[in-house]
Amino acid sequence: MKKIDINILGLGNLGTAFFEGLRKNKNLNLYFYEENEKIRNDFAKLHDVITSPHINTLDSGVLILCIKPQNINNFFESFSKKINKDVLIC
């Protein structure tokens, strides 16, 4: 069975909750994005994972947006061309 790519954008309380719920599933590849350097580095050290500040490109899988509602429009303006139409955005 092919693993599903799960991309979590935002590593605050909501992003961390998704991580906690998904991390034991061996059928998932988890990727993490957070602009705030301190939050990103603390999360990476605490959970022994690799994080990135930004999405370069997403061609498949699921993108879970864990960002504040007032930042949604800015996110889509900045990253819509980097996300393939086949990516499920939640």
Positions of predicted regions on the chain:
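NAD(P)+-binding Rossmann beta1-loop-alpha1 motif at the extreme N-terminus of oxidoreductases
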Residues: 1-53
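Short glycine-aspartate micro-motif
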Residues: 8, 88-89
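Hydrophobic/aromatic residues located in beta-strands of well-ordered beta-sheets
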Residues: 30, 89-90
